[in-house]
Amino acid sequence: MNSAEPDRSQHDNAPRMRGWVSFWNSENSIYVNARHRDVHFRAIADDLRAYVPGPQASVLDYGCGDALHADRVADVIFRLILSDAAPAVRERLRQRFASHAKIEVRAPEEVEAIADATLDLVIFNSVAQYLSGDELDRLLAVFLRLLKPGGRLVLGDVVPPAHSTVAAITALLRFAAHNGFLLAALAGLVRTAFSDYRRLRTQLGLTLYEEGAMIAKLEAAGFSAHRARTNIGHNPARMTFVAERR
């Protein structure tokens, strides 16, 4: 397999995106408890700091989710733009970081109004699986336009076709054991089996990528790309790619 494919048959993309945005815009059980949610976002923020090019960098985190520890990234750069498609998420971000001078929150359509070639780094973590290939191509064109020459896109947590449910569960339980919420994680796995996330994943599907297919997609969009040695976040079976604007 050398191309992107959904884990089910092709879906109508507009309802698919509306379904996923609605899920993230509402209360959900994707995190088993507050501890899980906190350490999840802290781990991501700490991983992202390694990609920061320097203290004068302007950075966009697109599809950032609740980004509880975005301040850890903002503290080592000049400017951090947080963007998410879910209005409720954006409102929480605005409230959480209202007093942080380096952080601003924008809707996706506001991101597209940013001046060309003004960003040093774009972060796009754990989002590609919710988009069709065409939708990802459109966003890659936006990111290419916004990045300075030599600027980088970090596309993280990409799900490969060979990624199994067992591998995902194992990664979660290891992360939970290391961070003190193992019992809650075990109970959460039972809830997830009957959750809206499982229902939506069955109905709408996820888009999966082989390593070579993602590199080819990034290079076709105008980037020089390679797979990073480690993935962002807790799941080592997923993939992170680093793409530099040519």
Features from the language model and the residues they span:
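Helix-capping/helix-break motifs at membrane-protein junctions
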Residues: 132-133
